[in-house]
Amino acid sequence: MKKSLFLIPLMAFLLCGCNEGAGGEGGGGTGTAHRYDFSTLTLKGTAFDTGSAYSAFLSSAVNGASIVTGVTEATNVYDGAAEGGAYGNTAGLVKFGKSKANGKLVLTLASNAKKVTINCFDFYTKTEAYPTNSNYLSVNGDSKLLPYAETAGKGDLVYNLASPSSTLTIETSNSVADKFGRCFVFSITIE
């Protein structure tokens, strides 16, 4: 009887794996949170190309650990913000989109991610000119309305990926016809 009580948990461990989040076979996650804090970026509105965007991720990796192995697209994504919006003329953030186009960033990862948390804010604050928010941010097609308030702030958007993936497509959009999505991103955490 004592042997069977010991063997049941051991067999469950061997059959199921030690931890679903460990990123091993069947786990689908990295097992570790990889955080990128863009507060150390120093430019104000310089367009990223794939190389400079990748460098920004490497330099922004908290504790030096990076799961990002490359950037395959950086379209209308900026190191810092030039004029306009809630954080105009500000370094230490990544701006997505512009008045005439959405922003898009495609990351390749060393292993599959299953959760992404983006600390961000809408391009505008709530004012008479902009009484409602229509800017969205998506990760791998999962679109969420951006945090929006009367004063500039920050909020987390959490994306639990439908399928673990080693590619992340982050892009803005707008629900109003003939408008384009814009936002400010302060940090990204990939798990």
Segments from the language model and where they lie:
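Extracellular ligand-binding interfaces
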Residues: 98, 109-111, 117-148
